[in-house]
C-alpha cells in the first residue's frame, strides 16, 4: 500500500468519524449615519411552542445590549415563517437558530463552506471575506485529512476573530422516550434517539406496533429535491434511500450502494444493490441514480447543488454500476453528499414539474411520495400527522410496524403526552427542564445526548452596524453564556465559541475559545473602533 493510498483511506475514515493563522480585522465600513445613534434592530427567533429556550436566550441578549447603549427588540414567531424570512427573503437583522448536529454535518463542509463562502447555499447573511472564500475552496479539494484539518482550523480562527456569528452554546440533544414501550433505541451523535438507526431498529413492546413520535413544528414539505431543513431530512430519509449512511459511530457504511470506491481524487465508482424496488413495485435501477443526479443538478437542488456542480460526467458502466468523474477533487463528497442525497424514481419525477402544474420542481408539494426506503408513505395530515409504515421488503426492514409523527402545540404538551403514554418519544429536542422532570417518572427516560450542533446568533452583515466586525465582536462579548448554559439549558450545554463544536473532535479547533461576557470590555472594543455615546447613553456611529 502506497503512502498516498494510506492517506486517502485515512481521510475517508476521519471524514466519516468525526494551524491557526494570524488574521486582520475586516476594514471599517463607511457609515452613512456618522455620529448618529445606532438604529434599533430586532432579533428574530422561533417562538416558545417550537423551542422555548430560543426566546429566553433572545430576551437575555436584548437586555445585555442595553449595556452597550443599543436597543434591540425580540421577534419570536412561527418557526417556518422565520426560516422563510432568513433563508428565502433574507429579511432579518439578527437570527437565533439551532444548527442541529445532523449526521452529514460531522463533515466541516456545512459550517465552513456552505455557511461562509460567498456563494454558500446557507450563507444568507451576506458574508464575503476573501480569506474565508479561499480557505473554503481549498478545504474542499484537500484529500489528505490532516491537510484539510489545518485549513478548517484556520478558517475557524478567522471566523471567530471576525465575529461573523456568535455560537451561543453547544447543547446536548435533550430527548425523552417511554422505555416501558420502546426497546433498542439507538442514540447517535447530534441526533440522540431521533436517529435513523432508532427508526429502523426500535421495537415496540405493546400495542399496535406503531411508534408515536412527537415534534413541535409542522412538516413543511416532502419534496426531496427542495429539502434544506433538518426536520424535512429526518422524515424524507425514512421514505427515500441514500447510497450510503453515517452509522451511530460516525462511520460511513454502504446502504443502497454495496460499494463506493474512490478510484482517485476525481473518480468514483459506485455499485448499486441488487433487488431493490420502489414502493409502487418497480425495480430500482442504476438509471434512476443517474437520473437523480442529473435532475437535481438541472433544478439546482439547494442542499446538493454545490457537490453536483463538481460532477463532470456520470457514466453507466454495467447493469448495476456507474462511474462519476469530478471536475476537481471534492473532499466533502462522501459524507456530505452520498450520505445525504435521496435517490428518485425516474418514472415518476421525469414528468415533474410539467404534469404537476408547477413551474419549478422546488415548488412541487410531493404529497404522495414514492421512494424505496425502509418506510412507505401512508398519509400526511398537514400540520398534524405524518404516518409511514414498515417496508417489509426492504433490505433492512424496520422492527416496528411504522411511525406516526405527531405535531404538538408546545413542549409542555409533548411532555404531557409522553408522561401519560400517548407519545412514545421525541424526534427533536425537548426543553431541558422538562427532560429532567420526565426522567423522574417510572417508565420514562429523559436524557441529554452528545451533539456537534450549536445555538447561534447570526448577523445580517448587510445591515447597519452589523457590517462592522468590531461591533459584532462587542455583541459576542455581551452574551451571558454562563446564565444560558446553567439556567436556560439546565446544564445540558457548553459555552459556544467556534462554528465547529468540541464534540466533533477531529475538526474542532480547540484554540478558538468562547468569549466571556464582559460589558466593559465590549464597550472598550467599540470605543477603540470609534463609537461614542450621547448624553443619554445611546451608542453613536463612528465618524
Regions found by a protein language model. Name each.
Residues 3-12, 23-26, 469-473:
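Twin-arginine (Tat) signal peptide motif
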Residues 11-38, 45, 52-63, 85-218, ...:
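Detector for C-terminal structural segments
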Residues 35-38, 85-91, 113-138, 171-211, ...:
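Short, solvent-exposed loop/beta-turn-alpha elements that line the ligand-binding surface or hinge
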Residues 37-49, 72-73, 207-218, 267-270, ...:
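Short, well-ordered beta-strand elements
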Residues 60-64, 70-71, 88-97, 164, ...:
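Alpha-to-beta junction loops
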Residues 71, 363-366, 390-437, 473:
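Ligand-site clamp/hinge motif
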Residues 180, 261, 306-354:
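Surface-exposed binding/hinge segments that line
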Residues 258-302, 317, 323-325, 417, ...:
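Aromatic- and charge-enriched surface segment that lines or borders ligand/interaction sites
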Amino acid at each position: 500500500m502506497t503512502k498516498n493510498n494510506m492517506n486517502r483511506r485515512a481521510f475517508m475514515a476521519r471524514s466519516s468519524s468525526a494551524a491557526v493563522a494570524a488574521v486582520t480585522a475586516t476594514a471599517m465600513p463607511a457609515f452613512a449615519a456618522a455620529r448618529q445613534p445606532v438604529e434599533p434592530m430586532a432579533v428574530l427567533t422561533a417562538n416558545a411552542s417550537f423551542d422555548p429556550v430560543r426566546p429566553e436566550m433572545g430576551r437575555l441578549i436584548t437586555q445585555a445590549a442595553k449595556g452597550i447603549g443599543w436597543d434591540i427588540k425580540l421577534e419570536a414567531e412561527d418557526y417556518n415563517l422565520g426560516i422563510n424570512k432568513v433563508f428565502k427573503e433574507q429579511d432579518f437583522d439578527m437570527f437565533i437558530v439551532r444548527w442541529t448536529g445532523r449526521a452529514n454535518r460531522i463533515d466541516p463542509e456545512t459550517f465552513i463552506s456552505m455557511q461562509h463562502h460567498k456563494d454558500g447555499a446557507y450563507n444568507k447573511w451576506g458574508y464575503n471575506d476573501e480569506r474565508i472564500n479561499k480557505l473554503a475552496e481549498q478545504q474542499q479539494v484537500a484529500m489528505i485529512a490532516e491537510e484539510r484539518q489545518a485549513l478548517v482550523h484556520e478558517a475557524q480562527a478567522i471566523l471567530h476573530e471576525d465575529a461573523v456569528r456568535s455560537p451561543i452554546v453547544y447543547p446536548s440533544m435533550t430527548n425523552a422516550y417511554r422505555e416501558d414501550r420502546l426497546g433498542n433505541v439507538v442514540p447517535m451523535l447530534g441526533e440522540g434517539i431521533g436517529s435513523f438507526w432508532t427508526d429502523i431498529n426500535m421495537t415496540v413492546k405493546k400495542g399496535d406496533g406503531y411508534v408515536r413520535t412527537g415534534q413541535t413544528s409542522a412538516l413543511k414539505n416532502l419534496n426531496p429535491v427542495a429539502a434544506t431543513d433538518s426536520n424535512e431530512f429526518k422524515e424524507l430519509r425514512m421514505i427515500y434511500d441514500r447510497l450510503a449512511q453515517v452509522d451511530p459511530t460516525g462511520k460511513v457504511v454502504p446502504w443502497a450502494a454495496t460499494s463506493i470506491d474512490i478510484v482517485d481524487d476525481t473518480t468514483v465508482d459506485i455499485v448499486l444493490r441488487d433487488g431493490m424496488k420502489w414502493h409502487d413495485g418497480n425495480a430500482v435501477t442504476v438509471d434512476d441514480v443517474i437520473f437523480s443526479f442529473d435532475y437535481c443538478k438541472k433544478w439546482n437542488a439547494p442542499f446538493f447543488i454545490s457537490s453536483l456542480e463538481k460532477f463532470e460526467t456520470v457514466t453507466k458502466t454495467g447493469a448495476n454500476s456507474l462511474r462519476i468523474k469530478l471536475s476537481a477533487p471534492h473532499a466533502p463528497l462522501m459524507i456530505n453528499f452520498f450520505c445525504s442525497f435521496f435517490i428518485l424514481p425516474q418514472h415518476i419525477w421525469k414528468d415533474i414539474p410539467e404534469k404537476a402544474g408547477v413551474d419549478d420542481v422546488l415548488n412541487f408539494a410531493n404529497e404522495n411520495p414514492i421512494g424505496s426506503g425502509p418506510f412507505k408513505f401512508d398519509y400526511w395530515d398537514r400540520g398534524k400527522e405524518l404516518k409511514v409504515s414498515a417496508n417489509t421488503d426492504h433490505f433492512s426492514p424496520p422492527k416496528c410496524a411504522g411511525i406516526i409523527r405527531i405535531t404538538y402545540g408546545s413542549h409542555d404538551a409533548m411532555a404531557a403526552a409522553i408522561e401519560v403514554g400517548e407519545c412514545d418519544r421525541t424526534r427533536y429536542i425537548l426543553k431541558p427542564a422538562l427532560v429532567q422532570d420526565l426522567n423522574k417518572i417510572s417508565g420514562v427516560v429523559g436524557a441529554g445526548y452528545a451533539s456537534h450542533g450549536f445555538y447561534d446568533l447570526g448577523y445580517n452583515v448587510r445591515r447597519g452596524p452589523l457590517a462592522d466586525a468590531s461591533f459584532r465582536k462587542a455583541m459576542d462579548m455581551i452574551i451571558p453564556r454562563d446564565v444560558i448554559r446553567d439556567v436556560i439549558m439546565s446544564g445540558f450545554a457548553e459555552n459556544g465559541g467556534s462554528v465547529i463544536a468540541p464534540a466533533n473532535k477531529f475538526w474542532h479547533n480547540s484554540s478558538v475559545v468562547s468569549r466571556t461576557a464582559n460589558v466593559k470590555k465590549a464597550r472598550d472594543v467599540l470605543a477603540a473602533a470609534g463609537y461614542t455615546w450621547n448624553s443619554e447613553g445611546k451608542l453613536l456611529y463612528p465618524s
